[in-house]
């Protein structure tokens, strides 16, 4: 196997401040320093990847750059003792694909501390069917359960339910016995959400409270919010006493206007979900759960596979909110 050059998407910034993307040949020697060189077999597409690929300086500071915040593959060289040549591994989070050359290339070089061994019972492709979006969904459920939320306490709402994070959250919660309500702007995808385990599907406009009231009727024991903005504001008002809300996204807005009343009168909690710097012990636990108790083969039906060359169109679709389920990139 030739480990000297590889194919990758490279995003360049032109003199006119435009960003252009091409699949090019790169040298392995151009990769950043790191303990472990990995041949990437699969990657996956996330909203943050599309931001990086279109020149968002809040995600990626300098160009040229290879995006891809997820990668799964085989170790081809390692300077550490715990990770060996031939090991199958997953890398998500940290700086991968942001300012470190990412998974939209056939090779990555990263610190050993970023690497999680592929859990038993999970294939490399399956790991990227989850990727950062699926891991974030699982981490949200993990934190919700850790806060004491149980199926017997009532309905759990998932916002952005047809997206990469939301669809996995619906699937996991349903498997754990929760009564899941999925909120989406794509009511034509109601059947998909029902198949994933949602007991009820509502239009996102139902989470658009304009009453000005600090609290509404308590409906949900828990909420997994993936979109932020006004929907999160409304969701906070509708959580029952002792409930919990997790939040991990901002596609519906980064501002949050609320009052203290849901917190001091209903004792609710708001938990931020960060999958980037998640502690390694929690990261291992969550990936192990995804490979075992939380696995749901139904997700396979809502995963599309594509090549590097086909990614350009996907960037546009995900930024427009028109991509459903998960997209896996086959790098082999």
Stretches found by the model and what they are:
Residues 4, 284-332:
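C-terminal hydrophobic helical "lid"/dimerization subdomain
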Residues 29-44, 56-96:
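Glycine-rich beta-strand-centered segment in the early N-terminal region that forms part
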Residues 87-88, 107, 175, 244:
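Residue-level marker of beta-strand positions
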Residues 90, 221-224, 246:
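N-terminal Rossmann-like NAD(P) cofactor-binding module of classical short-chain dehydrogenase/reductase
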Residues 92-156:
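NAD(P)H dinucleotide-binding glycine-rich loop of Rossmann-like/cofactor-binding domains
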Residues 99, 230-296, 330:
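Glycine-rich phosphate-binding loop and adjacent beta-alpha segment
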Residues 134-135, 160-167, 228:
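Glycine-rich NAD(P) Rossmann-fold beta1-alpha1 loop
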Residues 174-230, 288:
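Adenosine-nucleotide cofactor-binding segment
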